[in-house]
Curated annotation (Swiss-Prot):
Binding-site residues, Fe cation 2: 101, 164, 198, 201
Cysteines paired by S-S bonds: none
Cofactor note: Binds 2 iron ions per subunit.
Keyword Iron recorded: yes
Name the record gives this protein: Ribonucleoside-diphosphate reductase small chain
Reactions it catalyzes: a 2'-deoxyribonucleoside 5'-diphosphate + [thioredoxin]-disulfide + H2O = a ribonucleoside 5'-diphosphate + [thioredoxin]-dithiol
One function term, GO molecular function aspect: ribonucleoside-diphosphate reductase activity, thioredoxin disulfide as acceptor
Subunit structure comment from the entry: Heterotetramer composed of a homodimer of the large subunit (R1) and a homodimer of the small subunit (R2). Larger multisubunit protein complex are also active, composed of (R1)n(R2)n.
Length: 327
């Protein structure tokens, strides 16, 4: 039986620490704590309206994916990992991760409510799993690999790393290109916070696979899971580019295809198995965006000092800060 799943009936408290490396991962995650209200999107509204319609359509598809994906991650943490795992230090990490994923989910909802005032269009995005076949397909794939009745713990951790890494990564990179255009500062700030968090989540899954999982999946199974994730990302990116009529400034879908393969090979390395694609990085400027090397600058400077409500909606009241100097 896996060590992570063995109950220690004699242990009721977290101290004394028995798994210091896992505890350090938890403390690292704890240090990144933030809230969804800490980002100002007031400037983004004008940028969004000025954005060409095809480009807006591309980013709408990304938002539709994000609002669904984080809820599925939360579902897996609450119904599977947090019920099964018995090592307290690991359980602390996943408890903190679940809280972070709730912040991410709220942040994506704020983004949709801020940028898309039409309620019917908002609902189409919030109902992404029903309105977008590829998003539904991705959700089904995640649930398939997270099923504890069909997959070992090792297989599920590989799948979880693929979700937190592969399924999210291209979308993070696409949003980050808005920073190069000097637009959408709030969306970019959210993206930097969330991508950094997800990098730690993904890296921790790889750490557990390499250091705690006794029945590590065969390399061919790891490759199968990762390649399936890449194929889903390809399908989603093609769908999003079709919605944008192929016109998104800064990158092509072929560049995103290559990047996700480069990223996946690095994930293979972290899981101590052979690379699959052997391709270079088409976005060398995004090196810091890889896993837990996400840009950390200005995190504390972005903490709010003043607040303003950007969306006039009593049923969805949230406050956003004003300090122009933060950008």
């Amino acid at each position: 039986m896996e060590e992570l799943l063995i109950e220690n009936s004699q242990r009721f408290t977290i101290f004394p620490i028995q798994h210091p490396e896992c505890w350090n991962w938890y403390k690292k995650l704890e240090s990144l704590t933030w809230t969804a209200q800490e980002v100002d999107m007031c400037k983004d509204i004008d940028d969004w309206e000025a954005m060409p319609k095809p480009q807006r359509e591309f980013y709408k598809q990304i938002l539709a994916f994000f609002v669904v994906a984080d809820e599925i991650v939360i579902e897996n943490l609450l119904t599977n990992f947090m019920r099964e795992i018995k090592v307290k230090e690991v359980l602390y990490f996943y408890t903190m991760q679940a809280a972070q994923e709730c912040v991410h989910s709220e942040a994506y909802s704020i983004q949709v409510k801020t940028l898309i005032p039409d309620e019917k269009e908002q609902q189409r995005i919030f109902s992404g799993i029903e309105k977008h076949p590829i998003i539904k397909k991705m959700a089904q794939w995640v649930r398939q690999w997270m099923d504890p009745t069909k997959n070992s713990l090792g297989e599920r951790l590989v799948g979880f790393a693929a979700v937190e890494g592969i399924l999210f990564q291209n979308h993070f990179v696409a949003i980050q290109f808005l920073k190069e255009q000097n637009i959408m500062p709030g969306l970019v700030s959210y993206n930097e916070f969330i991508s950094r968090d997800e990098g730690v989540h993904c890296s921790f899954a790889c750490f557990l696979i390499s250091n705690y999982v006794y029945n590590i999946p065969e390399e061919k199974i790891i490759h199968k899971i990762l390649k399936e994730a890449v194929e889903l990302v390809d399908e989603f990116i093609s769908y999003a580019f079709d919605k944008a009529r192929g016109r998104v400034p800064g990158f092509s879908k072929e560049m995103l295809f290559q990047y996700i393969r480069y990223f996946t090979d690095n994930l293979c390395f972290m899981m101590q198995c052979k690379s699959i694609y052997k391709v270079g990085n088409p976005f060398p400027q995004m090196t810091k965006f890889f896993l837990n090397e996400v840009e950390k600058t200005n995190f504390f400077e972005l903490r709010p000092t003043q607040y303003q409500n950007c969306v006039k909606d009593d049923a969805f009241a949230f406050k956003l800060f004003l300090n122009d100097d933060d950008f």
